[in-house]
Amino acid sequence: MKKIVISLMLIVATLFSHDFGNVPEKKLSQIKKDRPLMVMVGKTKCIWCDSMAPQIKEIKEQYPKTVIYYMNADKDPLGAINNNIVELPVQLFYNKEGKEVARHVGYIGKKDLLEYLRTYGVLVE
């Protein structure tokens, strides 16, 4: 019985986790902001966050030197509060001085996301 319960818990956890591939998950306070980068902020059980995961994974695979992080607001609620994040998903764009230069709230398609990454100097082609 114990094995069945543990197995079911693992299955449920897998269903509600996003696959961002090799995009590291970090708390905002742990991210070294010394170069242009993007932080995708989402949370568990967020349909729009989940639908963006494959696109961000593809971008990271196509442009491996592009710095992208994922922050789960469920795991870093202080990071979300301290950065005035009230709606999800949100993409935060930082310059090399560590200053937030832009944010996009809501779902964004791959083509538009690539344009944001280019505009704010995050995309490394």
Positions of predicted regions on the chain:
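Hydrophobic h-region of N-terminal signal peptides that target proteins for export
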Residues: M9-S17
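N-terminal leader/targeting and pre-domain segments
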Residues: S17-D34, T119-E125
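Thiol-based oxidoreductase modules, predominantly thioredoxin-like and allied folds used
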Residues: V41, P64-L78
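Typically the conserved alpha-helix immediately C-terminal to a functionally engaged Cys/Sec
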Residues: D50-Q62
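Short active-site neighborhood of thiol/selenol oxidoreductases, capturing the structured segment around
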Residues: K32-T44
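Non-catalytic, surface beta->alpha helical segment in thiol-disulfide oxidoreductase systems
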Residues: F93-E125
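Positively charged n-region of N-terminal signal peptides that target proteins for export
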Residues: M1-I4
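Structural micro-motif
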Residues: N83-L92
